[in-house]
Amino acid sequence: MMLTRLTRLVTGTNTAPSLHCRWYAAATAEKSALATLRKKTGYTFANCKKALEMHGNDLAKAEQWLKEQAQTLGWSKATKLEGRNTSQGLVGVLVRDNIGAMVEVNCETDFVARNQSFQSFVQAASAACVRYVAQLETDANLTKHGLNSEALKQIKLEDGKSLGDHLALMIGTVGENASLNRAICYRAPAEVKLTGYVHPAPADDSTPDVPAFGKYGSLLAFRHTAVAEDSNGEAVARKVCQHVVGMKPTRLGDKARDEPAADKDDETCLIYQEYLADPSYTVGEVLEANQLEVVDFQRFECGEKVKAEEENVRATN
């Protein structure tokens, strides 16, 4: 009998180790599912664990339950936090073909502005605005659509839910108040091009179809004045878009009506400002040298105060 026990210990023929292995494998699978769910949703350890336990470790069902709970809690939290100051946030910019959108989304702290859930929402809002404008009736002119907070909340995303619903969901995730502040969207005819810029600029600028975000943003509508388009024209236009962010012009300016400011540091007309990339030239001189004309531009600074009438505009070229 002693020999039999020793043999079992050496060869592992006892049933206890086998049960232990099965328990260990199950525990490992649960940990893996928990880690996957947390990474995918960003919700707390406790909530993810509860969701998996309720749905037999079914990831899809657990994720759906978490989203439904977060939506309910998000609207509740959004109501409780409503009215709290949201002076921080991000500006999202997306140019896709002949449509450009710039959206400002605000939050309470810079800490949340760096949160992935918040940044993803800014990108989703930018893309939603582009899709929304694509569905509107248009004409042969450059159109400029201003959207206020309430109008933005009504825009539907591809999943059928509104931006307002997704805002509440995000508020429930980040735990502080947030708001859809405003948006400006352009839709350009064939002869007009669009470009955009955000500051700080993203490290990887090789994916133009992905919405960019920063503390400042600008959109620029431009066209070539020559029949043959200069291949460098779009690069110059983007530099001018960057100039708009840095130098804060308030209007385009017209040589026939406007005179340069007496003090160049006080200049607010875009065409008379010293070019940010090379102050030895004015923006107007750079545009003329590259056979470009700026049709319109818009600049957002996160947290700035603007007049309500500026958010509802329509421009023609």
Curated annotation (Swiss-Prot):
Q: Which GO terms describe its cellular component?
A: mitochondrion
Targeting signal (transit peptide) range:
1-24
The record, for Pfam families, names: EF-Ts_N (PF25025), EF_TS (PF00889)
Give the location in the cell.
Mitochondrion
Name the Gene3D superfamilies for this protein. DNA helicase RuvA subunit, C-terminal domain, Elongation factor Ts, dimerisation domain
Q: Name one GO molecular function term.
A: translation elongation factor activity
Primary site of residence? mitochondrion
Alphabetized UniProt keyword annotations: Elongation factor, Mitochondrion, Protein biosynthesis, Transit peptide
| Keyword Transit peptide among UniProt keywords | yes
Q: Which GO terms describe its biological process?
A: mitochondrial translational elongation
The record's annotation in SUPFAM superfamilies points to:
Elongation factor Ts (EF-Ts), dimerisation domain (SSF54713), UBA-like (SSF46934)
What family is this? Belongs to the EF-Ts family.
Q: What is this protein called?
A: Elongation factor Ts, mitochondrial
